[in-house]
């Protein structure tokens, strides 16, 4: 079966002198792998589009037995030269790519994650986002995948949580409780500023995040609590210089 679809290339590599393997995020099928036979020399079929940090329109098929995908041709949609020429920006984008490669995405959420990734690349290309930017991306991916706590009200009594008092985040249940309803046995106490920040990330996109400047304590608390949240619900944890499935 042949498909024509828009993708973002995550990673490429050689497996023969002129042939490449390509890992990409499809807007409809999630993370995919395919072979581009003659990809390193065929300008007619793949001219300038088989590089990471590229948005590409691919025509794909399969081999005769249907055991693997074959890229038949591609055309560049957007190349992100600003990312490729800046090591810091490249690192921010690569961090987001590594998370996408490691996370198991729900099929129904592929389009939302694809749109989120392309918007994230646009922002990194055009602006100079904070080093914390990939965390916002990871949190938003988790929310788009359905792991979407309500950071605004207590799950027990329904009381709004946006006072100055700390709240309790039950990571396993994906719920927040006010201090009055917390039984003291489950959950992690977080500041109201952290709860407001995570609620804001839920409701906004990458173009809004570039203006966010967080105090150091809220930054660290957001990182700590969302790292554990994604480890529990998505099975992915940051370790060393990459992500590990658990």
Curated annotation (Swiss-Prot):
What's the short name of a Pfam family annotated to this entry?
RecO_N
Keywords attached to this Swiss-Prot or TrEMBL record, sorted alphabetically, are: DNA damage, DNA recombination, DNA repair
Is-annotated flag, keyword DNA damage?
Answer: yes
Query: Is DNA damage found in the keyword set?
Result: yes
Q: Where are the transmembrane segments?
A: none
In terms of InterPro entries, this protein maps to: ARFGAP/RecO (IPR037278), DNA_rep/recomb_RecO_N (IPR022572), NA-bd_OB-fold (IPR012340), RecO (IPR003717), RecO_C (IPR042242)
Q: Name one GO cellular component term.
A: bacterial nucleoid
BP terms from Gene Ontology: DNA recombination; double-strand break repair
- Gene3D superfamilies annotated for this entry? Nucleic acid-binding proteins, Recombination protein O, C-terminal domain, Recombination protein O, zinc-binding domain
The free-text function statement in the UniProt record for this protein reads: Involved in DNA repair and RecF pathway recombination.
Which NCBIfam families would you find in this protein's record? reco
Its family remark reads:
Belongs to the RecO family.
Which named protein is this? DNA repair protein RecO
**Whose protein is this, by species?**
Maridesulfovibrio salexigens (strain ATCC 14822 / DSM 2638 / NCIMB 8403 / VKM B-1763) (Desulfovibrio salexigens)
């Amino acid at each position: 079966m042949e498909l024509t679809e828009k993708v973002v290339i995550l990673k490429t590599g050689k497996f023969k002198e002129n042939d490449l393997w390509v890992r990409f995020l499809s807007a409809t099928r999630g993370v995919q792998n395919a072979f581009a036979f003659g990809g390193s020399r065929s300008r007619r079929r793949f001219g300038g589009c088989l590089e990471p940090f590229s948005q590409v329109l691919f025509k794909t098929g399969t081999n005769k037995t249907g055991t693997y995908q074959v890229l038949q041709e591609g055309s560049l949609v957007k190349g992100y030269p600003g990312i490729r020429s800046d090591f810091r920006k490249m690192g921010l984008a690569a961090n987001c790519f590594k998370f996408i490669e490691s996370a198991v995405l729900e099929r129904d959420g592929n389009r939302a994650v694809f749109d989120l990734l392309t918007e994230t690349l646009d922002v990194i290309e055009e602006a100079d986002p904070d080093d914390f930017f990939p965390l916002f991306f990871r949190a938003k991916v988790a929310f788009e995948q359905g792991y979407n706590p309500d950071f605004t009200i207590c799950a027990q009594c329904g009381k709004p949580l946006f006072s100055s008092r700390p709240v309790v985040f039950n990571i396993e249940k994906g719920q927040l409780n006010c201090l009055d309803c917390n039984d003291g046995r489950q959950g992690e106490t977080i500041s109201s500023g952290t709860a407001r920040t995570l609620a804001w990330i839920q409701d906004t996109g990458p173009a809004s995040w570039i203006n966010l400047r967080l105090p150091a304590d809220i930054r660290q608390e957001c990182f700590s609590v969302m790292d554990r949240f994604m480890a529990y619900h998505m099975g992915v944890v940051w370790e060393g210089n990459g992500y590990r499935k658990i």
